[in-house]
Amino acid sequence: MARLPFNMPLLSVVIPTYNRPQFLARVLTYYAGLRFPYTIIVADSSAEPTAKANRQLANTLRHNLNLNYQYYAEDIHVADKITRALTLVSSPYVALGADDDFTVPASLKPGAEFLESHPDYAVVHGEAVYFVLRPGAYAHGAITGVGRYAQRTIEWSTGSERLIDHLTRYTTTFYSVHRTEQLRNNWQCAARLRLDYSFVELLPACLSLIQGKSKQLGGLHIVRQGHAGQTSRTKLPSVMDWIVDSAWFPQYSSIQDLLAKALTQQDGITEEQARLAVKQAFMRYLTDQVVAAEREQRGRQMMRLRLRESARRIPGLKKAWRAVRFLMPVRRNTVSLEAFLRRTSVFYGDFMPIYRAVTGVNDGG
């Protein structure tokens, strides 16, 4: 592996935040408790008095964290905010975070070292999971479930193949470890196009997969909170509302132009071939999103009906099933709340600090 210059920081984490002080306090306190070894840049565009509280929190935690708090105007576009924060990163590798999610510190160094040793890769991540809190809870409370959040390895030799594969079964690369210069340039492209929130994450991810391969390593990397509603400007419309919006096609056309240009440079193909590849990739993406939305809606309806029927027929079923399930043997890499709370789980050591930060409980008992 190539050596970095002496004293150059390996990696940094950028956390955009907006009007969610409880989440920001939760994640920064988690990092402080673990003596997080890398620079954290907080990119805050909250309204007052939330911004004041966030600044005070950052000042309080600076003795435990290498923390750089940056304030931006409340109306700044998210792509502008991330781009400006990325210009402050001095390390060769970077990962974006979110104020309501947890990046596992132990996953970052292996990701950066993998990129250092593999110049044909642009994106690295580990296992990703999500957790759900009991109804009514916001930033703290009992965790009621844990599930796997899909991440992928994409290793085709051409940017066209990688782009098509990526959008055929889209998974986010937002939280992955990236090369700083590449990610900064990719977000600058998104900022210049003034994209809406449905497109703004897609473009940097697509550019990254054109520029290099994607690798999923072992180990827990990101633990996300799943919740239906939140105080944020980034709540996304349904896929059908997004497609039929009058702004959709002009933005898609701008993205197609940019991605086609990137493909001609990366693969040495004609502009016509590149535009066809982009079109094919987005057709597959939209098909996948529409099918997934329909499947999710049907699944929710069926689940509600089944739960109601079971609850009527068998009083106490839910409580009894949880008790029995906790006693059942599971594999060491199983993704479930019951599995994660067992010391035999490969995820136990990385998950428990997050569990404590969210629930205030020291163990799963």
Spell out what each predicted region is:
Residues T29-Q70:
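Acidic donor-binding segment of Leloir-type glycosyltransferases
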Residues T144-T168:
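Short, flexible, basic/aromatic active-site loop/helix in glycosyltransferases
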Residues Y72-V89:
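Glycine-rich, basic loop-to-helix element that forms the pyrophosphate-binding segment
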Residues L11-F23, V27, L34, A43:
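A conserved hydrophobic helix/loop-capping motif in glycosyltransferases and polysaccharide synthases
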Residues V129-F131, P135-G136, F174, I210-Q211, ...:
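Active-site donor/metal-binding and catalytic loop motifs
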